[in-house]
């Protein structure tokens, strides 16, 4: 017998050795408003078919959890692949990236044509049939050579390259009916779990819609992101030109000794984009009918806002402009007036953390050519101070505001739109592990943050992981709603950044204790990083955006 401690109930029960989690879950009585999809066993994510042979702590998870959503979405991608293969046997499907609160998938039929509305409807109907049939996702361990042979025969060369460079002896594959596929993490037990989904024709492919994270019985509301898709398409085009569509391609190139070239290309592409932005700002600044005086820069945590802002300042100077940095931090309300969260802690991400009325008053004066004494925030006392710091804009001056709320219209509502230039910085990862395993868009930002926080002595890896859900909630509420308002989106994703981050992050993630809740995420990230051939950071230049996270930068 094995003794199971259920964290959901705080109680123990005994079961026969080898009992699967699928049979254990119903024996514990707790509120289950939604179907159980996964579990954490000793703080490691496991599928419900996992069999328990030793005493363990178990926490059962539904769709409202990050792990539950990942299991569901991954399984849904396999369901889509199976339906597409059933209807269009010679087609090629690629799960490109999360977008518009779903997943964009490209599908190329054997005649080279794109999907039609009718095709998508038929695929959706076939997916429904497969759900109704409740077919199990069968898990099997294969020797790496056996798996490579299977995927060579099916023409999945992207998987072949990934498996040839991952260094594993055995891997876990899944089959759904007559289709075998590889996923880098677990799936739900069967298709019957996947009741809520939608498919929609999107840019010649499919937008796979997933449930709402708070109300899994409903689809997540559709949120169009045309500018984000445009940036993704541009980055994907460059990757295609270089022959680097997935991690296997990148690993193969690194193993051939091309890491230095990949670093230089990544740097050149980012600098080219910064130059283009600077030149557009100069053009707008010189336009008497559209005179840009204020540049607003924002983006989610660890997107590289500060470094991009500094590099943009250099290029603006090269254009003959005089950039002046203007920090919203200096306009924080006094700490005693800071909004609070329900638990009583300070909500530093709240829009009202900034005294936006006072900030706008100074902005209007500055943009009208007046001299203004600006405050400086004392983070020790938690109060604004005036220390004789005066600002005045000259004829060639441009004011740069970089901050969490920079694109929130309320922050600069008294400034005419024609005087603003809005930049949104994000990490839009365009390579995938393989054609059916896209990389979560927030993983590189989380890894950047973990490494930076640790190297600067600000937080341990455990603390950074623990705080990440709060960071993400703030981004969803305060930052992403204004992404499509930007004049330009800058993609700060770096072609070999996971390979570089691996050399720093592995030892840092290894410090997370196994007996804490954050271990499950540390374990997942370590497993994920193992797919990348490591690259030394010695050739990353001091001005690189990555240096802001791994250290050794000149800014």
Question: Would you name each region that the model predicts?
Answer:
Residues 50-69, 83, 92-100, 104-272, ...:
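Auxiliary tRNA-acceptor-end handling modules of aminoacyl-tRNA synthetases
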Residues 295-297:
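Hydrophobic anchor at the beta1->P-loop junction of P-loop NTPases
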Residues 305:
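Conserved lysine of the Walker
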Residues 308, 312:
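Hydrophobic positions on the alpha1 helix immediately C-terminal to the Walker A/P-loop
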Residues 318-336:
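Short beta-strand-centered segment that lines the nucleotide-binding/catalytic pocket of NTP-utilizing
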Residues 333, 337-380:
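Conserved nucleotide-sensing/catalytic segment adjacent to the nucleotide-binding pocket
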Residues 360-417, 468-482:
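Glycine-rich phosphate-binding loop used to anchor ATP phosphates in small-molecule kinases
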């Amino acid at each position: 017998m094995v003794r199971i401690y259920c964290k959901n109930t705080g109680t123990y029960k005994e079961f026969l050795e080898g009992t699967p989690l699928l049979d254990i879950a119903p024996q514990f009585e707790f509120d289950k408003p939604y179907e159980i999809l996964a579990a954490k066993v000793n703080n490691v994510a496991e599928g419900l078919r996992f069999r328990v042979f030793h005493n363990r702590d178990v926490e059962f998870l539904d769709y409202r959890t990050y792990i539950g959503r990942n299991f569901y979405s991954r399984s849904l991608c396999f369901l889509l692949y199976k339906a597409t293969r059933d209807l269009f046997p010679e087609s090629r499907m690629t799960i490109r990236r999360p977008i518009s609160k779903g997943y964009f998938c490209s599908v190329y039929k054997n005649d080279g044509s794109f999907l039609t509305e009718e095709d998508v409807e038929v695929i959706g109907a076939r997916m429904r049939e497969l759900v109704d049939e409740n077919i199990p996702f069968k898990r099997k361990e294969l020797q790496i050579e056996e798996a490579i042979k299977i995927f060579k025969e099916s023409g999945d060369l992207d998987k072949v390259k990934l498996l040839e460079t991952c260094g594993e002896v055995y891997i876990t594959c899944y089959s759904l009916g007559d289709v075998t596929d590889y996923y880098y993490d677990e799936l739900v037990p069967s298709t019957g779990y996947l009741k809520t989904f939608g498919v929609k024709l999107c840019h010649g492919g499919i937008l796979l819609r997933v449930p709402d994270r708070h109300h899994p019985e409903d689809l997540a509301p559709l949120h169009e992101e045309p500018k984000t898709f445009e940036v993704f398409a541009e980055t994907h085009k460059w990757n295609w030109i270089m022959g680097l569509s997935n991690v296997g391609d990148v690993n193969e190139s690194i193993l051939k000794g091309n890491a230095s070239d990949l670093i230089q290309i990544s740097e050149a592409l980012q600098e080219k984009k910064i130059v283009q932005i600077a030149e557009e700002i100069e053009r707008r600044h010189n336009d008497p009918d559209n005179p840009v005086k204020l540049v607003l820069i924002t983006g989610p945590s660890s997107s590289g806002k500060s470094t991009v802002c500094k590099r943009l300042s250099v290029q603006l100077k090269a254009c003959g402009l005089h950039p002046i940095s203007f920090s919203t931090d200096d306009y924080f309300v006094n700490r005693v007036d800071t909004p609070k969260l329900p638990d009583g802690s300070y909500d530093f991400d709240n829009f009202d953390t900034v005294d936006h009325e006072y900030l706008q008053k100074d902005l209007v004066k500055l943009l009208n050519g007046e001299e203004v004494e600006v405050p400086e925030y004392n983070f020790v006392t938690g109060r604004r101070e005036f220390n004789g710091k005066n600002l005045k804009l000259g004829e060639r001056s441009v004011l740069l505001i970089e901050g969490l709320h920079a694109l929130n219209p309320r922050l600069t509502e008294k400034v005419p739109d024609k005087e603003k230039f809005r930049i949104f910085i994000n990490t839009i990862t365009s390579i995938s592990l393989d054609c059916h395993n896209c990389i979560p868009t927030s993983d590189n930002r989380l890894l950047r943050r973990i490494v930076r926080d640790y190297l600067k002595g600000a937080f341990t890896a455990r603390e950074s992981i623990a705080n990440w859900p709060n960071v993400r909630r703030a981004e969803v509420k305060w930052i992403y709603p204004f992404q499509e308002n930007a004049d330009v989106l800058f993609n700060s994703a770096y072609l070999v950044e996971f390979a570089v981050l691996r050399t720093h992050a592995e030892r840092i993630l290894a410090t997370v204790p196994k007996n804490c809740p954050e271990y499950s995420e540390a374990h997942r990230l370590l497993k994920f990083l193992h797919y990348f051939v490591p690259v030394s950071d010695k050739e990353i230049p001091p001005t690189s955006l990555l240096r802001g996270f791994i250290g050794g930068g000149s800014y």
